[in-house]
Amino acid sequence: MDNLNSAVQVLIHGSNTLFILLGAVMVLAMHAGFAFLEVGTVRLKNQVNALSKILSDFAISALAYFFVGYWIAYGVTFFHPAAALTVDSGYALVKFFFLLTFAAAIPAIISGGIAERARFGPQLCATALIVAFVYPFFEGLVWNGNFGLQEWLKLEFGAPFHDFAGSVVVHALGGWLALAAVLLLGSRNGRYRDGKLVAMAPSSIPFLALGSWILIIGWFGFNVMSAQTLAGVSGLVAVNSLLAMVGGTMASLLIGRNDPGFLHNGPLAGLVAVCAGSDLMHPIGALATGLVAGALFVWAFTATQVRWKIDDVLGVWPLHGLCGVWGGIACGIFGQQALGGLGGVSLESQAKKRLQGGKKEGEGGRGGEGRRKERRGRRGRKEEEEEGEERERKKRGERRKEG
């Protein structure tokens, strides 16, 4: 009997490890989606640079999270013999891999907002600071109960802050940090002339659409596999993700007047918003969440670009920042049993965490993206923006060879 129990435990640990590894690979693939979404949106002269930044950001994120960030969030390090790390089929290692892919999404989100003008080196430095210190602080607060915030919310409002797959912890944080960076860098040269918006059309709608589809597919790993064990898997999460994606698509199709950029970002808005409550909502609540998110994205993107003159290239603040905030609040609404949800969530806790988080996220943006005081050090020269960052970098390399 003991041998049978031991064999069952080995099977369970092995299955859970494989399960979360597959989730990590699916979310890792989403970074290809981030890359192609940015490549399709920026101008042709900046496509190669966009690809290079996403991959480089991921590499820096992996180092920062492995050596510092994961320890800050969970108090876990990997400075142990390999024999100790392979306990339970190495589940702890693969869990790190899975959560790393979430952490690395933050700089990928920010990259889309500051595209075509941020300098390569300073952006990588900001990535290291954010993934090592800023993101793990918020991650630990919500997902590891650090500093007693969750206990306080539970005592005060009857339930802790609930964010199953990161509407707030990942997406809202990334979106608000991106807004801080966009405001810090200013708009691209030529984006506004005499106070009016100058159109800068996406370079490739097919690449933009490809990026959107890669993200949509990977998102089911992002949400469903946030259960982190086979025993925790719920078909409710999958269907809620599907219907929120559909809701975002329909809203952006109707309100965005068939604009392909809006159409392919609408489903992403719905998926961002449903992350928080995908394990609690009724599918109709998830559909409503996606509909609101799609409409919110179209309205906010238009307002930021035209009315407020904020040059957020991919619209990451509306998409991730605002829709992420809406997702946290929607979880508190549609997660209630009275509206068909599973319950165990408090609207007060969801709103309170957002009010506290907004100020700190802005401070984190100024601390990470705003560490370097001089705009010239953070932003490419006018020649780089006009000719394209990649071409200018090649010219500098040729001049060094000639010298």
Model-derived segments and their meaning:
Residues 357-403:
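Acidic, glutamate-rich low-complexity segments that are typically intrinsically disordered
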Residues 2-359, 403:
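Glycine- and aromatic-enriched membrane alpha-helices
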